[in-house]
Amino acid sequence: MLIFFFFFFFFKYIYNIFILTCFYITLSSYYFIISFIFSTLMFFYFCTFYVISLFFLYISSFCKSIKVTQLYDKKIKIKSFINNYLVSCRKKKYIYNNVDDKSNIGTFNLYHNIRDNNNNNNNNDNNNNLKKRDDVLFPLCNKNIINDVQKIYDEVNNIKDKEQKINYLMEQCSSLCKENYFPPILNLNKAYRNKRIDEFNKGNKNFYINEVGKNIWYKYVNRCDEILFMAIDIQIDEDEQRNNSIKDVHDVHDDNIKTCTLIKDDKHFEKYKDIHNDNILKNILPLDKKIDSIKNMLNHKYMKKKKCIITIDAYSNNLILYCFLYLILKHINKMYLYSFMNIQIKEITAKLKELFDLHFNVHHIIDYIHEYIYNFLMSYHIKRKKNKSKNMKEKDIKNVFANNIIISDEENKHISKESSDMYKKKTTITTTTTTKKKKNTMKLFTYPRIAHMLSGGVDSLMALHLLERKKFYVDNYFFNFTNADCSKNDIKYVKDICKNNKRNLFIININDEYFDEVLVPMLFFYADGKVPNPDIMCNQKIKYNFFLKVIKSIYKQKWNYRTKSKLCNYDFISTGHYAMIRTNDKNNPNNIFNNNLFIKKKKKKIKNIKNKKNIKNKNNIKNKNNNNNIYTYNIYNLHNDNIKTNYKKNNKYFYKLLVSNDKKKDQTFFLSSFNHIQLSKFIFPLSLYTKKDVKKYMNENNINNYNHKETKGLCLFGNIDMQTLLHKYFVNTEKDDIKNKQNEDNIFKENNILNLNNNFNQNEKKKKKEKKLLVDITTTSSHLKKFRETFIPKMNLHYKNYLINLDDQTILDINSDIHLYAIGQHKNVTNYLHNLYNKKMININGYKKKHVKNVISSFQWIVVYKKIKRDMSTNLIHNFIYLTKNYDQDLFTHIRTKCKLHNIKWIEGKLPACIKKQFKKYNKINKKKKKINNNNNKYKTNETFHVYNNIQESGKKKKKKKVKNIPHDEKTIFVKIRNSEQIKKAKIKFSLSNNTAYLKVKQKDTGFSPGQIITLYFPFIIKKNNKVTYITNLNKYNNLINTNKNTIYYHCLGSATISNQFLDYNLYQHIKNIHQINDLNMSK
């Protein structure tokens, strides 16, 4: 370069002289002198430049030969002129490389032709020519990470808004988001390899951030607050893939498998880890000890001769976490493992997390990486020891364990003697054991996908807020029933709720399904004279069966990648019901909302029960002559084994339905028809909340976009008069109304009967104050036609109604209208009779007098009993309805306290344990009775019979009192007959036939109508030892003197339907006399 400058200026000087001579010829001497001066100045300028260039050349040769020596320390920085020179050299593709390790003194030289440090693959991938270990080099090799973090830290500190910080983070990874961000693997229950990435990626890229080996698994990382998959590739001896001798490391933070398993056979390895005489070594060591143990393993002699390179790749469906990981992991690509362990990654990630104000559990991610490295190196050590120590003695094995090669705790060196048997086994046995365990290694704690039933009210909205707090993936579903006005109002609120917060919403039209599954069966029940419960039918058939079908079809459409349709159903269904589920499944989200209210099963009692069954079967054969004993034993065996159920047996987990914290708004009455398998799919977030708490939360947070009116009446219909709805569907045309009038005129009698025409129903429509129906003929014309064409011909609606007064023994009215009342009902009957006698009141002179008080129109009439008789000859249905004004008489005590049950459905699928225990007590009492009677009968004679009975009565009064309190054929149970009522105590007596029983309530009820559903409960208490004790005496625990203050929970056992009422003999005779007086035959 200097020679070039020399020749350039030399020729230029000659050229200038040549020009001057030319001018000398033409011009005068004055101009010649000026040009000569200018050329001399140029010559001096050339000389100075040449001297300066020689000086710099001398200095550069001096810098190449010099060696800089200084003591090694992390905190000491290299001098400023060397650092500045490094920056200039990096542009020319130079780098610090070779280091000689001599008493911690570093000698630094410069090398040519090495890859630039600014690339991503800059981290020690190029050190193929090294012969010695570069333990001193790690601060310089990892300097790019520190510099990048410092830049980010300085730039983000100036930003104050959180949104701007996140935008900055996204800008740093803008190219990554476009290329690498694609949907996750749906089957989270399994790990996947990088071959699976091609299925979801448009390009041919087989990695997310850094490229990993082909056989490396992407495994799920638990407890990170987001879905995160991570792949860690550790290579030894410059191999591209992992050695085949080293097997996959166990998953970190798994509950079933211990994370510190160093030998593949876990059963034998547990015996080597006895600490503090009883305690086993914990699954997760402290992080400081774990890092020290990794460094100690890397400092072994045979490890210093080898290269250990690490690359980390990760993926998350959360884009913010994905970009955050990219900033940290982009430099960890084929990095030396020793230098990686000396980087303080935990401190770096903690600072970045505080900068960006993120909520992710970053500490747990780094613990996962360190634990994976720890397990990998331990397995590598053991694999190496196995090859050397096949015939090792017990003493040598103890020394291996004590020298901190396998167990890193120096204080605890108590190791058992059972050692060599583990190493003598074949490798095939170890592989089979590990493969079996790998099926259950992945225990996922991901946020579940939930299908939430959003109705537009307060309760469902509060449940949605609680689910979103826990970061569940929620999709909202609304059941749209266009025939009801309440659903039209609710859909407005539902749309506002989902629009404001950008929530998912699916609207399901259920007009046809509700008509076929709920409305038609309900009308058939009423036609047979029974009183159904459409709310329970709606929960079972629409909100569960039909809803599951809809969910599957929607999810197929939603997750349809390319041509492959992958079905991934929702994990749970959530509702706004006030109920609680108790389960021992720790992964069930119901434990989050009920404060982990689960109890462990007892294993000891199961064995005793099996032995007792065999003993009792033998006793049944011996005691055939005693009828009382046969009766009790047959019931016990019948309910233990012979009940037919369609439920699958699941011995691991149980799911029990409990009453919620708000006992007034409790809705377990509507959920009692579900079995335990169906309950396992439900979540009830409002289990511990009351209605006051919900409204208080809404007021404090200023949430008003919900329907403030409470839903009452029929399910999805709202407030509706049942009698008017029955008239709409059962009364066909106007001709039928005329026929009803003619039949009533023929039935008319002068004695104790007043004529009533069906014009009453038509005149009511003209009133202004009349309540409007929610169901109109215009909106449901198709359903009405379908019902009249297909279902009415199957029904027999030819009624002849008798309204009978039990107090005066008279008949109030006979008609052929539809009077299908429930027992205990008073509103519709009294309105009917008041309007009848006010409108049709006839004076003696023939003039009508309206609104005249009389005996009938001034009282409230209540339905006490009803009976339906079918006349096969005339095809008429005689409907006898018995009414009274005084419902609190002693004559009606039995009919208000007793009934017969059938179709008993237990939630567990078998007789509950709280009732089984009562059978055992009664059997013990009966056995004692037998022994006493058998011993006494030996010495009885005709002479001493009377004397013996007197002695027996006087001497055994105490034992008789105990037997009277607990009769052998009755069991205590608690009952709720209607949703709005409280839980009552009752006695139940099971019959010999299957699924039938007799019920007796202590307190008087409003009435038991056939077809009505009753829910069965039993209270219990949880003691300090987490043991459940079922109780029968509530006064003991509700008392103010109680010091324990145990809360009483109610366990919902199941449901049953009322088949008929219990008629007392006195009431039967009273009804019989009325029929004889009025010439009404009971045989009709």
Curated annotation (Swiss-Prot):
GO cellular component entries: apicoplast; membrane
Protein's UniProt keywords contain NAD: no
Residue numbers annotated as active site: C538, C715
Source taxon at top rank: Eukaryota
Name of the top EC class for this enzyme: transferase
Cellular compartment(s): Plastid, Apicoplast; Membrane
Gene this chain is encoded by: MNMA
Designated name of the protein: Putative tRNA-specific 2-thiouridylase
Pfam family, one: tRNA_Me_trans
Gene Ontology molecular function: ATP binding; tRNA (5-methylaminomethyl-2-thiouridylate)(34)-methyltransferase activity; tRNA binding; tRNA-uridine 2-sulfurtransferase activity
Recorded catalytic activity of this chain's protein: S-sulfanyl-L-cysteinyl-[protein] + uridine(34) in tRNA + AH2 + ATP = 2-thiouridine(34) in tRNA + L-cysteinyl-[protein] + A + AMP + diphosphate + H(+)
UniProtKB keywords: Apicoplast, ATP-binding, Disulfide bond, Membrane, Nucleotide-binding, Plastid, RNA-binding, Transferase, Transmembrane, Transmembrane helix, tRNA processing, tRNA-binding
Gene Ontology biological process terms from the UniProt entry: tRNA processing
Gene3D superfamilies linked to this entry: HUPs
Cross-referenced InterPro entries: Rossmann-like_a/b/a_fold (IPR014729), tRNA_2-thiouridylase_MnmA (IPR051305)
E.C. number(s) listed in UniProt: 2.8.1.13
Record note on disruption phenotype: Parasites require exogenously provided mevalonate for survival. Apicoplast structure is disrupted.
Coiled coil: none
Residues spanning the membrane: 1-21, 32-52, 309-329
Family of this protein: Belongs to the MnmA/TRMU family.
Disulfide bonds: C538-C715
Job description of the protein: Catalyzes the 2-thiolation of uridine at the wobble position (U34) of tRNA, leading to the formation of s(2)U34. Required for apicoplast maintenance.
Membrane topology: Multi-pass membrane protein
